[in-house]
């Protein structure tokens, strides 16, 4: 079986009539292939199914955050509802800032409400930078209740095609649970839009977790804009479409970091959006200005990822450290997995240190960056730092080779000895502005002006249904 995501998508969507996989509810027909596609490929790549909001831990977490700013939903009308997660917050000048939406909100004439999924982290309201914020819990809990009472059974038309796709991918998911989740999203958001003052626009991240919401918003005449949070390419299942599907549950606009993603979405993918738009990355401007000039390589930032890939990254670096004559200072930045969890598995030498600083601060104060296949591989370049990708199970190349393969400051390594040779060769680092300029196609400059142009372009936008 081919293991390239793009090839697998082509295989599935040319062989099967994926548009015919539907469910009927509320006197409407829903194309559910995108719902299944997002989850089955996620499980195939990462090894586990992504239905975090269905776990007992998640339900308890949402209940605890039920009153976190929730009054803000009811007491005023907003220009924008912006759906995000608390993982997007990083500490800047004493305040936890949402790196997707807080800065663009300052360029808008209207009010922004940040609606935050707080499964992973929760920050005190007094310590966040957002002017208006609400927990997403009220929506999630209402969906859970509705699903349990009214969606006990689901009917999927052409379910046999799902089984054929799962067989081809050698991976299966709980299709009924996925369908219930999205139907509950749709039904309850239609309810809340009758109760709450409606926004003029909805901004969100991770559209493939919000299909039910998107359809509800667009049916109510509210345009939806997705903001890029990670890699967008032919090897991301949520953005690579060959099949032509109805636009009703897809965002109208996708705001991206740079020209590579813009060209891919506008010219190659059949994802049924109206257009993509380049704005850049707000967090990059801030930290690039504060990044130290590159020196002889001594310190290395490491962007860890959750799950088995994080452990394999550490195993690789520990092996590298044992064989390297030079003992570099490694600054490890975990994502959600805790430092204590890693230390239960590994014994770290003195030159490996976990840091409490966010990944951008860490990169800007180190000489180079290493990761497996985190988006940080791209961002490090715009911060002026060389990017080294550990090609575990060929995933780094699957994700980044088409995007970064021609960049002279990007290096894929399969074995620890390769990294030793490269660092010896790269002992003299290039100036940070040289590395930054090499990445303009991936993260555009002029973030402020790009945001202002985007907001202006939305003024006459109608949702495509």
PLM regions: where:
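Catalytic-core helical/loop segments in enzymes performing group transfer/polymerization on anionic/lipid-linked
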Residues: 1-465
């Amino acid at each position: 079986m081919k293991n390239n995501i793009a090839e697998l998508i082509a295989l599935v969507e040319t062989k099967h009539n994926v548009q015919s996989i539907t469910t009927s509810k509320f006197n409407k027909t829903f194309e559910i292939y995108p719902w299944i596609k997002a989850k089955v490929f996620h499980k195939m790549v990462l090894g586990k199914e992504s239905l975090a909001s269905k776990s007992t831990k998640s339900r308890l977490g949402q209940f605890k955050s039920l009153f976190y700013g929730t009054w803000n939903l009811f007491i005023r009308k907003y220009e924008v509802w912006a759906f995000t997660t608390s993982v997007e917050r990083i500490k800047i000048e004493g305040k936890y800032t949402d790196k997707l939406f807080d800065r663009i909100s300052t360029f808008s004439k209207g009010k922004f409400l940040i609606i935050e999924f707080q499964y992973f982290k929760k920050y005190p309201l007094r310590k966040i930078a957002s002017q208006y914020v609400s927990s997403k819990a009220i929506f999630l809990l209402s969906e859970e209740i509705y699903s349990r009472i009214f969606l006990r059974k689901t009917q999927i038309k052409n379910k046999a095609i799902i089984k054929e796709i799962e067989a081809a991918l050698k991976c299966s998911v709980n299709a009924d649970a996925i369908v219930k989740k999205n139907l509950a999203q749709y039904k309850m958001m239609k309810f809340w839009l009758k109760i709450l003052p409606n926004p003029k626009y909805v901004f969100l991240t991770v559209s493939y977790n919000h299909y039910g919401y998107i359809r509800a918003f667009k049916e109510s005449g509210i345009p939806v804009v997705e903001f890029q949070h990670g890699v967008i390419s032919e090897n991301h299942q949520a953005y690579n479409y060959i099949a032509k599907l109805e636009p009703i549950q897809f965002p109208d606009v996708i705001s991206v970091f740079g020209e590579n993603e813009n060209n891919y979405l506008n010219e190659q993918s059949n994802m049924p959006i109206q257009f993509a738009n380049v704005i850049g990355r707000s967090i990059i401007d801030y930290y690039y200005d504060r990044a130290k000039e590159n020196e002889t390589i001594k310190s290395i930032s490491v962007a860890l990822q959750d799950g088995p890939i994080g452990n394999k990254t550490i195993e690789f670096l520990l092996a590298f450290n044992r064989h390297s004559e030079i003992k570099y200072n490694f600054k490890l930045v975990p994502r959600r997995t805790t430092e204590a969890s890693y230390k239960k598995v590994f014994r770290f030498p003195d030159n490996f240190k976990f840091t409490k600083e966010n990944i951008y601060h860490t990169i800007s104060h180190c000489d180079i960056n290493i990761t497996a296949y985190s988006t940080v591989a791209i961002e490090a370049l715009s911060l002026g730092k060389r990017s080294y990708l550990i090609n575990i199970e060929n995933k780094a190349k699957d994700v980044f080779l088409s995007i970064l393969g021609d960049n002279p400051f990007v290096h894929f390594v399969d074995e620890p000895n390769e990294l030793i040779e490269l660092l010896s060769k790269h002992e003299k680092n290039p100036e940070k502005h040289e590395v930054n300029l090499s990445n303009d196609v991936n993260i555009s400059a002029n973030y402020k002006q790009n945001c202002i142009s985007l907001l202006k372009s939305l003024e006459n936008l109608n949702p495509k249904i």
